[in-house]
Amino acid sequence: MIIAPSLLAADFGRFAKETVRVEKAGAKWLHLDIMDGHFVPNISFGPQVAKTLRPLTRMFFDVHLMCSKPEILLEPFAKAGANQVNIHVELGDQVTPLIWKARSLGMKVGLAINPPTAIGLLHPYIGQVDSLLIMTVNPGFGGQEFIHETLPKIQQAYAWRAENKLSYRIGVDGGINFATAAECARAGADTYISGTGLFGQRSLKAAIKKMAAIALKNHPAGGFDPDHPIEAAIANVSAQNASKP
């Protein structure tokens, strides 16, 4: 199971210290929400933040591009040290070129889907990606209420993975707390993006540990294969950063 704290919920004036704190709390992933004010109504930050934070941590940088023109950000984020980029299936004909462009830059690729979008739009791409990211709120702002009607999307993604003998991760993002993490785990999720659900707790370390235990307990397969390509990538990122002076 992967518990990925979302930097969007951290103190914007202390990103460097917050990143170090997240890693010390036991997180292997850091989720970076990139919003352009067009695809979603909010604006967050850009690749310079990732570049600044990269030398401070061994964590896997999972970048979520909520942008109308993600193609202009792929190379800057690759150079900044992103390990995976999530693009939106709602971009239609742009999706396949974006997948291949991201791969050519050495990044893993996730495909995100918004709550109102039909899950079937993901199916043509399931053999091309490393992760499916099921948005469980309408993207753009942190701290929203979990949309329970998104649970069947998680179940479908889980069924497709088994039916097609694939190995993509199934992530959930939005309104993820201890209770909703359990619901998502029962539906088949194995990667949990959580902002206020983690940062709002007294102890971030205890919160990450508790959410991971809840997810593991409720998941139908008891977790996920540690030999999954992204699990291997996380280990590789940690090893590479550990070897740096």
Which residues does each predicted region cover?
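Post-transcriptional modification and biogenesis factors for structured RNAs
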Residues: I99-N114, P124-Q128, E149-I170, G174, ...
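Short glycine-rich anion-binding loops that position phosphate/pyrophosphate groups of nucleotides
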Residues: V137-P139
